[in-house]
């Protein structure tokens, strides 16, 4: 997946865009703004519009809209995963305070680079994120099957012991899927920490090189 998979992103309160980010030129912002005007303002939902080989993905929650424009080759699930990260970060930084009073585009400088970081993270970890999404879907499916089978068994008046055995079997499947999801999340955390440690090591090395060059070795004196 290339870095150009994500084209444009914004966060809006109602129809007012508070922060946006893009590295591309084009009419994506105006089309996204038009889509924003058409979104139901009261519902907490997810929407995707298709236009000119691109998807305009929206996550609406508590009066705020989170949008990302992506190439249509990128799965909707990955785009929504990006929006979930942006939403969580935005609410953590501004929820209940600055977000409710900010004016149009006033958070560009602060939150624009943050959206870029989330874009890069999703692109770099797309494979692991898709696996995690798949595991979550499997868990949801198992839960649905479990409830459906229990309802059918009750309707048929099955023996309670048989019903308990079936429930335990489905519960074991759900636990296995949950275990897989935990393993994927742990792998993502270790990879992210590894990157941070490498960057820290490089910075320390640069400081050491500068120190040696300025002091002509380790014998700095006042």
UniProtKB/Swiss-Prot annotation:
InterPro entries: Longin-like_dom_sf, Longin_dom, Synaptobrevin-like, Synaptobrevin-like_transport, V_SNARE_CC. Residues 10-115 form the Longin domain. Residues 131-191 form the v-SNARE coiled-coil homology domain. Pfam families: Longin (PF13774), Synaptobrevin (PF00957). Its main location: membrane. The chain crosses the membrane at residues 198-218. It comes from the Eukaryota. One of its GO terms (cellular component) is early endosome membrane. Residues 219-222 are vesicular. It is a single-pass type IV membrane protein. Residues 1-197 are cytoplasmic. One of its GO terms (biological process) is vesicle-mediated transport. Expressed in flowers, leaves, stems and roots. It is found in: Cell membrane; Early endosome membrane. Involved in the targeting and/or fusion of transport vesicles to their target membrane. Belongs to the synaptobrevin family. This is Vesicle-associated membrane protein 724. The lineage of its organism: Eukaryota, Viridiplantae, Streptophyta, Embryophyta, Tracheophyta.
